[in-house]
Amino acid sequence: MIACVQMKLRAEDYRTEQSFATRIMGIMERIRREAGEGPLLVVFPEHIGTFCILSNAPERIWSKRTFAQASTALLLHNAGAVLHQMLVHRVSPVRALFLARAQEMERIYLTPFIDAAQKFQAWIVAGSAALRWGQTSRVFNTAPVITPLGHVIYRQHKVNLVEMEQRAGLDLEPAPLNYVSAVRSPFGALGVAICLDAFHGEVRGRLQELGAEILIQPSANNHPWDDWQQEDWLRSSYAAVVKHKEFGLAVNPMLVG
């Protein structure tokens, strides 16, 4: 069975690492119960882990009205570590905040998915998060693939960034096209194209060349689902599978709210 998770963004799911873990494990428990026994692939939406940067933050940060305000307060709360990263790597304050919080944020984000993969014997594409690449100053929108043994066997970085991910927003880095690869699984070869990447023919073409059979498109959208948006979305997974016959199947989970 393949499960596609549409998840509504709720602040209370990120307040602590325990609340995030409870949310993920609850979703996985329900999916396994509905699926019964047998092979299981679960795909979560884009940026599901990015908001883990706020987990375990003091109440004064959570009292802010918007994510932008809370992020600014978090930056000031971590001013010393942020300044250190800015000086060492010569990066923006936003990038420096991701670097300063990288190790804890990745732990909070990935641990529940690893535990869930093992407990429920599932392959999981854990949506995505803004993650540091090793010990470099590079931060990508990254989608991890996890096996039922709890091994993170692959991390796909996003190639084409939307405006809020670029320098004036989250200050993420676009990945080169040659970072795109396919992942072998019992369900067939998985090709992960994070949100906007699935709209781009060069990304889908590379996945085809690498033998991908299932297109995985973790997405996030906080805009109204109006007529234009619905029509425009047909240019991604739908076009790849129905119109162009590039893949046998596509999975497109969405983070909303």
Residue ranges and their predicted role:
Residues M1-E17, R155-H157, G188-D197, I216:
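Active-site-proximal beta-strand elements of phosphoester/diester hydrolases
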Residues I2, G26-R60, V82-L87, P93-R101, ...:
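Active-site beta-strand/loop signature of hydrolases that rely on acidic residues for catalysis
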Residues E12, T50-L54, W133-T136, P224-W225:
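Short catalytic/ligand-binding loop motif for oxyanion handling, primarily in non-cytosolic enzymes
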Residues T16-R30, Q103-T111, Q229-A240:
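Well-ordered, non-membrane alpha-helical segments in soluble/globular domains
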Residues M25, P174-A182, G188-E202, E231-D232:
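A Trp-anchored, charged/polar loop motif used as the substrate-binding/catalytic surface
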Residues L54-Q69, V145:
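Aromatic- and acidic-residue-enriched segments that line the glycan-binding/catalytic groove
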Residues F67-G191, E246-G257:
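Catalytic-core segment of enzymes that process non-peptidic bonds
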Residues Y109-V125, C195-G257:
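CN hydrolase (nitrilase-like) catalytic-core segments centered on the catalytic cysteine
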